[in-house]
């Protein structure tokens, strides 16, 4: 027995943002002849299920999301083809933040991404309080009016000390004083560009390693002081040398102030940050008065001011002592929070000796001057899928890595560079500081236990699987010893790079 069934096709068309059709829509009617016997219908259903499963297996999609809101969609349907992605424009999605935060975000949507990232903290508006934007919008014109007054005051001060007093007429004297004020303020303005650059471009660095950046601030400030010192030799190049020196000192100030605020916050364990800052001013002003007194005694020494080599030698000697004292003052700081440098120390100690050092010992072993990028083993965080796939852009390698790290919030792979091993880490959406610790533990275990050389991709994957197994067995012990050693696990300076994140929810297996 047969019957005729009429189905309007297509039954379902998934609509995507990237696929459109220029053909006019037609309603097709498909006539199918089917048997009324249940067994035949089941066979047709099974065939349809097989085709549907085949499509799902064939079309695997991975979404790579970027910090500026854009994303790239990868189709992993052909193991033999190179990895390719489709870049998608930014989509504005509503979130669950407060109404004030949503209003703040709406007010800045017209700003280009580069300007937004330069002006506002990372994660704005969710990373700051709701009144942040309103305060800054009022603070900005306040600072403008303050600097206008500063220019007028500078001009008056220069007139008072006699600048332009020998120019003849009153009009000429006024013009000379104004020109001198413009040159002096221009010097300050050029220097202010350094603070603008540091605050906008490197603002996210200070919370992680305030010791290092406070030390670098003194190095750069020393270079700026040297340019100021050189104006005595080349007075005709005063504006160039003074502006360069002021620029360097402004960069140093841009590094110094945020770093020291982090250090002050570390001191204020009772929530008394304002009092700690005020008492620090007492220490600083007292030191300033003593230093000014000794400085006046030195320059008042007969014959010293006229001898530039002696001035240079004296300045160099005192500056070296100053840098040594600065290093010693930073070396005694004892942070009980985990940053990337300290995380490397405690992870290596646990992998090699099964011991986690306390924060006092770890801070003593921390290298203040060394950048993380120069530490061994070399670990590159926040890489893209294309970088993970290697030079060959292998789809099969990416699929194997995604499957291996299904339970993790990151993907770690490695490359052999001569005698050194380089690790690359890509984080997934919703990764936390705990995942940063896990990838560090895995990298150090591989560095310690992996054989000197490996021949092919299969051996690399073998070691990766082995390291994941070891980490599953020992990471809980690491966290327990970290807690018992006195480390603050509630607060962490291990930040997940948000420039590139993998959306695991779009990965079908």
From Swiss-Prot:
Pfam families documented for this protein: UVB_sens_C, UVB_sens_prot
Top-level taxonomic group: Eukaryota
Region (Disordered): 22-49
InterPro entries referenced in this protein's UniProt entry, alphabetically: RUS_fam, UVB_sens_C, UVB_sens_RUS_dom
Cysteine pairings via disulfide bonds: none
PANTHER family tied to this protein: PROTEIN ROOT UVB SENSITIVE 5, RUS1 FAMILY PROTEIN C16ORF58
Family classification: Belongs to the RUS1 family.
Protein name, as recorded: Protein root UVB sensitive 5
Organism: Arabidopsis thaliana (Mouse-ear cress)
């Amino acid at each position: 027995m047969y019957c005729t069934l009429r189905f309007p096709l297509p039954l379902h068309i998934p609509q995507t943002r990237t696929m459109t059709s220029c053909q006019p829509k037609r309603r097709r009617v498909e006539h199918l002849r089917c048997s009324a016997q249940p067994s035949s219908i089941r066979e047709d259903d099974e065939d349809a299920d097989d085709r549907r499963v085949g499509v799902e297996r064939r079309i695997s999609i991975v979404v790579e999301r970027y910090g500026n809101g854009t994303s790239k969609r990868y189709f992993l349907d052909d193991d033999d083809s190179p990895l390719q992605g489709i870049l998608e424009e930014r989509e504005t999605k509503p979130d669950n933040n407060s109404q004030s935060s949503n209003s703040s975000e709406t007010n800045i949507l017209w700003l280009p991404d580069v300007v937004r990232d330069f002006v506002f903290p990372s994660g704005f508006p969710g990373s700051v309080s709701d009144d942040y934007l309103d305060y800054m919008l009022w603070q900005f014109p306040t600072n403008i009016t303050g600097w206008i007054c500063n220019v007028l005051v500078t001009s008056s001060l220069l007139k008072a000390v006699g600048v332009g007093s020998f120019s003849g007429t009153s009009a000429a004297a006024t013009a000379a004083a104004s020109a001198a004020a413009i040159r002096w303020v221009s010097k300050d303005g050029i220097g202010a560009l350094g603070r603008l650059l540091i605050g906008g471009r490197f603002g996210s660095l200070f919370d992680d390693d305030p010791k290092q950046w406070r030390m670098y601030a003194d190095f750069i400030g020393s270079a700026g002081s040297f340019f100021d010192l050189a104006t005595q030799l080349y007075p005709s190049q005063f504006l160039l040398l003074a502006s360069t020196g002021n620029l360097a000192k402004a960069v140093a100030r841009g590094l110094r102030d945020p770093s020291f605020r982090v250090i002050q916050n570390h001191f204020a364990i009772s929530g008394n940050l304002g009092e700690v800052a005020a008492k620090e001013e007492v220490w600083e002003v007292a030191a300033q008065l003593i230093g000014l007194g000794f400085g006046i005694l030195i320059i008042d020494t007969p014959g010293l001011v006229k001898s530039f080599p002696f001035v240079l030698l004296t300045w160099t000697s005192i500056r070296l002592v100053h840098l040594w004292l600065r290093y010693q003052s930073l070396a005694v700081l004892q942070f009980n929070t985990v940053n990337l440098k300290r995380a490397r120390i405690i992870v290596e100690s646990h992998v090699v000796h099964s011991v986690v050092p306390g924060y006092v010992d770890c801070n003593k072993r921390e290298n203040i001057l060394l950048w993380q990028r120069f530490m061994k083993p070399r670990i590159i965080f926040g890489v893209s899928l294309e970088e993970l796939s290697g030079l060959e852009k292998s789809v099969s390698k990416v699929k194997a890595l995604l499957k291996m790290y299904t339970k993790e919030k990151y993907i770690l792979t490695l490359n052999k560079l001569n005698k050194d091993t380089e690790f690359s880490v890509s984080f997934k959406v919703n990764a936390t500081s705990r995942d940063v610790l896990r990838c560090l533990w895995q990298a150090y275990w591989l560095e310690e236990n992996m054989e000197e050389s490996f021949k092919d991709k299969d051996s690399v994957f073998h070691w990766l699987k082995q390291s994941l197994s070891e980490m599953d067995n020992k990471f809980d012990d690491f966290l327990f010893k970290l807690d018992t050693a006195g480390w603050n696990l509630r607060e962490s300076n291990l930040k997940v790079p948000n420039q590139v994140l993998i959306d695991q929810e779009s990965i079908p297996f």
